[in-house]
Amino acid sequence: MASWLPETLFETVGQGPPPSKDYYQLLVTRSQVIYRWWKISLRSEYRSTKPGEAKETHEDFLENSHLQGQTALIFGARILDYVINLCKGKFDFLERLSDDLLLNIISYLDLEDIARLCQTSHRFAKLCMSDKLWEQIVQSTCDTITPDVRALAEDTGWRQLFFTNKLQLQRQLRKRKQKYGNLREKQP
């Protein structure tokens, strides 16, 4: 299953804690953890310092407490935990699926589960709030969608339409018909 993973599993950059101005890059590939740094200093003795790089296999990174400490210091404990999990072979396959496939999967979830999923990451929040998802949900829950309802959904959004009760929906459709009916009468 891991064979379809890209060569680069994770990449991030960061700056050292103050007062340091040094830059760091952490790159996790299928087989290695690559840690790069660039010393930034106004002092003349450090101006000729060349960038550095440390390459470790996943197994070696798991045993290298110094490199793990540096990773936690620069990038934070959550990034360190994520990298350790990648090194142990615990991949986040769900996060790597295409948006269309995820939208199809999410459309089968209960509303409470969609609300919880929305809180897990920025990507899932964007997907859970997308009109594409709510259009799928409305189509699966309604027998037929009239052209008037579809036009209203295009104006207000499918999510808004889904959470609108039937009485409000009828009133909004009536207002929309009156509005566009008046516009048609005014046209020569």
From Swiss-Prot:
Signal peptide: none annotated. GO terms for cellular component: SCF ubiquitin ligase complex. It comes from the Eukaryota. SUPFAM superfamilies: F-box domain (SSF81383). Residues 91-137 form the F-box domain. The keyword Membrane does not apply. Keywords: Ubl conjugation pathway. One of its GO terms (biological process) is SCF-dependent proteasomal ubiquitin-dependent protein catabolic process. Substrate-recognition component of the SCF (SKP1-CUL1-F-box protein)-type E3 ubiquitin ligase complex. This is F-box only protein 36. It comes from Pongo abelii (Sumatran orangutan).
